């Protein structure tokens, strides 16, 4: 009897695993793909939609563009996973049976119990989120004046927060909109935990774009018009975007899989506490010893290739590969500019300019080409 492998999620981890699984299984098992949407979002470029909604067509890849005809796709939100029955529950009440499952559900925004943060902030986790930010910023800019500009606040100065602030600055400048932008970070410096040279390069470009940066002052509360801090005066705002962290999806709460804050624990071969369930991406915490993988697109891409191979090997009773994360550097955009750091083979540690911008565009285009086609990537190139 043919076995069934079910992949949950259409983010970088899920979509990448589908491509890898199709390649390595070679028709030896049935593949079922379950996801909330009938598309994969190129999330690390979704901030472009904030400035220009027309970009959505470039960052939205339909599942039929990605999967082979033999892979069955089911649109639905996962509500539970029963390892005893080997069943996945969906929001419409249906279930999907599996012999092996890969959890690649991504993450949701973490609010850390800060009062009012969930209720009064926008997030950037989906295409609809990016479109909502665009509309809210446009509306606020329309109501602002040079004497009383609209205040746009981005909370969290990690990758997503920096890129979001940069894109809002491009929106402002391209439309000469009366907007001031604030980027907030609770820790001592923007892009926390990274190389000081990279942090300095990013800060320089943000300041050049007229973005006001505040660090080392955590948010303690938010209401419908102001943000409150550990010290100092409240900051009144018109639009508040929160990008300050991630946590696991609630649908895994009742699962018996070992997890930490709903992120499933997995070994370096991606097997979880249940032999028939594997996990990768933001929904997983992979045990890599002293070098944990970051919750980034780069890590998800790498893991997806090995996870697909391992699931195919598991169905054949073969020994599984162990994944080792390879840091291939960091690429971040600040509007039309970009900063690159730690790129293998490049003697300069941190650099910007056309070379950094070209590298960032190239990475996005390569992912789109790998998922769909070179032609699709070429059409998306101007929007990256």
For each of these PLM feature ranges, what is it?
Residues 71-150, 241:
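FAD-binding core/adjacent interface of flavoenzyme oxidoreductases
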């Amino acid at each position: 009897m043919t076995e069934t492998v079910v992949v949950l999620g259409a983010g970088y981890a899920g979509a990448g695993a589908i491509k890898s699984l199709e390649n390595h299984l070679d028709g030896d098992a049935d593949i079922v793909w379950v996801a909330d949407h009938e598309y994969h979002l190129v999330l690390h470029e979704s901030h472009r939609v904030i400035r220009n909604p027309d970009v959505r067509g470039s960052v939205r890849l339909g599942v039929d563009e990605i999967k082979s005809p033999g892979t069955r796709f089911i649109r639905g939100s996962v509500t539970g996973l029963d390892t005893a029955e080997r069943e996945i529950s969906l929001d419409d009440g249906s279930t999907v049976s599996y012999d092996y499952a890969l959890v690649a559900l991504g993450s949701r925004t973490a609010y850390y119990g800060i009062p009012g943060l969930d209720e009064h902030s926008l997030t950037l986790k989906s295409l609809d989120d990016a479109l909502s930010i665009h509309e809210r910023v446009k509306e606020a800019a329309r109501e602002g004046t040079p004497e009383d500009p609209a205040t746009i606040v981005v909370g969290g100065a990690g990758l997503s927060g920096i890129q979001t602030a940069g894109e809002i600055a491009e929106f402002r400048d391209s439309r000469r909109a009366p907007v001031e932008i604030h980027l907030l970070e609770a820790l001592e410096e923007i892009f926390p935990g990274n190389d000081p040279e990279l942090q300095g390069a990013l800060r320089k470009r943000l300041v050049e774009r007229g973005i006001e940066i505040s660090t080392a002052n955590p948010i303690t509360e938010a209401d419908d018009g102001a943000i409150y801090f550990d010290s100092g005066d409240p900051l009144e705002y018109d639009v508040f975007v929160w990008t300050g962290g991630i946590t696991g999806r609630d649908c895994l709460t009742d699962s018996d899989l070992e997890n930490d804050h709903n992120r499933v624990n997995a070994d370096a071969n991606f097997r979880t506490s249940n032999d028939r369930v594997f996990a990768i991406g933001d929904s997983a915490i992979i045990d890599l010893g002293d070098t944990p993988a970051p919750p980034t697109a780069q890590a998800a891409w790498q893991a997806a290739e090995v996870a697909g191979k391992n699931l195919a090997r598991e169905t054949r009773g073969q020994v599984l590969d162990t994944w080792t994360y390879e840091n291939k550097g960091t690429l971040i955009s600040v509007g039309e500019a970009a900063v690159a750091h730690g790129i293998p083979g490049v003697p300069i540690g941190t650099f910007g300019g056309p070379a950094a911008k070209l590298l960032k565009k190239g990475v996005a285009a390569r992912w789109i080409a790998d998922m769909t086609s070179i032609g699709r990537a070429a059409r998306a190139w101007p929007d990256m």
